[in-house]
Curated annotation (Swiss-Prot):
Mg(2+) 1 binds at E256, D300. Monomer. Interacts with DnaB. GO terms for molecular function: DNA binding; DNA-directed RNA polymerase activity; zinc ion binding. It comes from the Bacteria. It catalyses: ssDNA + n NTP = ssDNA/pppN(pN)n-1 hybrid + (n-1) diphosphate. The keyword Transcription regulation does not apply. The keyword Transcription applies. Keywords: DNA replication, DNA-binding, DNA-directed RNA polymerase, Magnesium, Metal-binding, Nucleotidyltransferase, Primosome, Transcription, Transferase, Zinc, Zinc-finger. Mg(2+) 2 binds at D300, D302. It comes from Rickettsia prowazekii (strain Madrid E). Contains an N-terminal zinc-binding domain, a central core domain that contains the primase activity, and a C-terminal DnaB-binding domain. This is DNA primase. Binds 1 zinc ion per monomer. GO terms for cellular component: cytoplasm; DNA-directed RNA polymerase complex; primosome complex.
């Protein structure tokens, strides 16, 4: 009996995988998942994990993985189709009979899948020393060539002859998406003189091919024509290899090209898939979210990559929530993922992953970076664009968080660029002052002094991101901040080694100024050993926010007649002043005690 793909999906949704697994082994709840001793290898410590929400099992020991049907297949020795039938019978689920059209569809599908497997065997036999050398120069190893079944389609009639010898009608190759027809009616091999890369579905069946030209012909890459088994809007290259790793790491990395996937997989990043040169679709996103809660986009940094990012952002915003996330790796200029890992190594790419930015941060980068906002109109347009993004979010809590995030970014990055600094006499909360620095510059120095005196604070991502994203008036100080965060904080340099490292740089004078025991830029009470760092951070953050408010307050008074908005600024300023006064009293009490 043949079972449809739709019925497979019905079983996955209908039957809790933990109920089936529990019949074979004891499971213990751990957070939202279950754990137990793996039935597929000997172990003493449970490494077998089951997730009902993701409808998936994974063993951290032997790497066995799959859905409820795959588990039944592995346990019973039955085929995938037979296991689906067994589960349906065990749970009293009626198996729908195939209609005549469905039978014809699956017969045709089987024929196409068989032709594609034969085509792949042929392509694999055509790898010449020249082709292998090309692949080796791209740092693709012999093991990887075999693992991904990379082949070659020669520029001759061997391909057609191969199938004719097997008594397979040439028109069947067209149904499989392997050949095309010229305007004059002549049939041609779609992948002639191209490296071939088989595209497999989630069940590890070849459903199409990608082809990469050897020379400079265009198009450089192409895919099989779409068929009844191959739709680019649904398939992701590498998905059959990525799913178990994505489940294990609770994330997927989405790139643009075949060789990006191959290079990253070879470097140990097995959770990588590619979108086959097409726009990312809702189907792609939902498929990846079923395996892991986070999708990390790693697209080229050129204009095409930025446009692809914007399309994906607009597609994803109605779908994301506090659990289902999108983030972005920002590649250095001129690098694609393949180049990044081959030229700089796996550790370099791992650091790029660690420094990935959130969806909200990517939106801000796209709308703000490299642009000027000198006029009220330009600023209003920025606010409108950001609001439009927020309005696409369906999750109300997340939408509110995005509004707050963009509001904070506008304060930090736009208001601080105004030349005029307004300090109303009502502001009785003062930071340590100097004849050489404005109050804002004093705060910039104070933030940098935190790097040196309290580096533990920067383990908090929110604090690190806030400091890193500030646009300093003092550009030398900004360069010091970037260097110190990346080279000292991120690399966890030991305290007794820092001075020797900084001494060899152009930042040594700044370092000495900021690291003095009687630091001018931090209040005397902040230098106590028992200072509560959370209060210290609140004080500095609120002080910085207050200065921004004061500047925006002044701009609002001078540039428009929106009195309601002016009153809101004034009310917020008074509120922050009072909060700072309370914090000041806390520090005074600490100093006295």
């Amino acid at each position: 009996m043949r079972v449809t793909q739709e019925f497979y999906e019905f079983l996955r949704n209908r039957i809790n995988i933990s109920d089936v697994v529990r019949q074979k082994l004891a499971l213990t709840r751990k957070s939202s998942n279950y754990v137990g001793l793996c039935p597929f290898h000997q172990e003493k410590t449970p490494s077998f994990t089951v997730s009902d929400s993701k409808r998936f099992f994974y063993c951290f020991g032997c790497k066995a993985s799959g859905d409820v049907i795959k588990f039944t297949s592995n346990i019973s020795g039955l085929s995938y189709n037979e296991s689906a039938i067994k589960l349906a019978n065990d749970y009293g689920i009626e198996i729908p009979k195939l209609t005549v059209k469905q039978k014809e569809f699956y017969e045709e599908s089987d024929n196409i899948l068989n032709i594609l497997e034969l085509a792949n065997k042929f392509f694999r036999t055509q790898l010449t020393p020249e082709i292998l050398n090309y692949l080796y120069k791209r740092n693709i190893t012999e093991t990887t060539i075999k693992e991904f079944s990379i082949g070659f389609a020669p520029r001759n009639n061997k391909f057609e002859k191969f199938f004719l010898d097997k008594k397979i009608d040439i028109t069947k190759l067209g149904q499989a998406g392997l050949i095309g027809k010229c305007k004059n009616g002549k049939i041609y091999n779609l992948f002639s003189n191209r490296i071939t890369i088989p595209i497999r579905n989630i069940y590890n069946k070849i459903v199409g091919f990608g082809g990469r030209v050897l020379g400079n012909e265009l198009p450089k890459y192409l895919n099989s024509f779409e068929t009844i088994v191959f739709q680019k809007s649904d398939i992701l290259y590498g998905e059959h290899k990525a799913i178990s790793s994505s489940y294990k790491k609770n994330r997927s990395i989405l790139v643009e090209g075949y060789f990006d996937v191959i290079a990253l997989h070879q470097a140990g990043f097995n959770e990588v898939v590619a979108s086959l040169g097409t726009s990312v679709t809702e189907s792609h996103l939902h498929k990846l979210w079923r395996a892991g809660d986070e999708i990390i986009l790693c697209l080229d940094g050129d204009n095409a990559g930025i446009k692809a990012s914007i399309r994906t952002i607009n597609l994803a915003l109605p779908l994301v929530n506090s659990e289902k996330k999108i983030s972005f790796i920002r590649l250095p200029s001129g690098l694609d993922p393949d180049d990044a890992v081959n030229k700089n190594g796996a550790d370099f790419f791992a650091k790029l992953i660690d420094k990935r930015i959130s969806l909200s941060e990517m939106i801000w980068h796209i709308e703000y970076s490299g642009k000027n906002f000198r006029t009220a109109e330009e600023k209003a347009n920025l606010e409108k664009n950001l609001k439009d993004y927020c309005n696409k979010i369906s999750d109300s809590n997340l939408k509110a968080s995005y509004y707050r995030f963009f509001k904070d970014q506008i304060w930090q990055n736009l208001v601080t660029k105004q030349k005029k600094i307004i300090t109303p006499s009502s502001n009785s909360v003062l930071i340590a002052s100097s004849h050489c620095y404005s109050e804002l510059e004093m705060l910039e120095h104070a933030f940098c002094a935190l790097l040196i005196k309290f580096p533990i604070m920067f383990a908090e991502k929110d604090i690190r991101d806030f400091i890193l994203n500030l646009n300093f008036n003092n550009k030398s100080l900004e360069e010091f901040r970037n260097w110190y965060l990346n080279e000292i904080i991120d690399n966890k340099v030991k305290e007794n080694e820092i001075t020797a490292i900084v001494e060899k740089t152009s930042f040594f004078d700044i370092f000495l100024l900021l690291s003095k025991a009687d630091n001018l830029f931090l209040d005397i009470s902040f230098n106590k050993n028992n200072i509560r760092l959370d209060l210290l951070w609140q004080w500095l953050y609120k002080k910085y926010y207050l200065i921004n408010l004061q500047q925006e307050y002044a701009i609002s008074i001078n540039s428009n007649h929106d009195f309601e908005k002016v009153l809101l600024y004034k009310k917020e300023i008074i509120k922050i002043v009072n909060e700072l006064q309370v914090l000041n009293e806390s520090f005074i009490n600490q100093t006295i005690t």
